[in-house]
Amino acid sequence: FSPGYSVGYLAQEPHLDNDKTVKEVVMEGVQNVVDTLAEYEEINNKFGLPEYYEDPEKMDALLARQAELQDIIDSMDAWNLDSKLERAMDALRCPPEDQLVKNLSGGERRRVALCRLLLQKPDILLLDEPTNHLDAESIDWLEQHLQQYEGTVICITHDRYFLDHVAGWILELDRGEGIPWK
């Protein structure tokens, strides 16, 4: 892949930090958004400090940074992070957000990893059997999500019904040879 593109990979057996909660793992996918919101909040808290409101230069710098962050937050649609997180976790039937990863089954771990990856929004998604461990409603949500996905999605799957709903075109790999398939 060309430099500058982000790639996200869903493995069949994802490696997750066993000491974290479900929500902490999912939030890893949007850490840049969380950090930006935290910096914005930190700047807003500084407006009430005398060292800033009594110094016009510091206040101007603070206002300029706040405006930059506001633009970044708006472009990432970060104000809706909590609702996006809740919607994705619910649609993929993730376990309760406070549950420790070490107590999850293989299927639950995979749903958590998929949720984290989809919220991360990499330029290129590599999905290895993405419908494994998903119920029909979760598969339907995933199909709709991938149909609207702004990046490139590459799926390795045996689920032809799923492929029919999400694939723009299919490349069948057989003994090292790629064959376009319609």
Task: Give a label for each model feature.
Residues 1-182:
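ABC ATP-binding cassette signature C-motif
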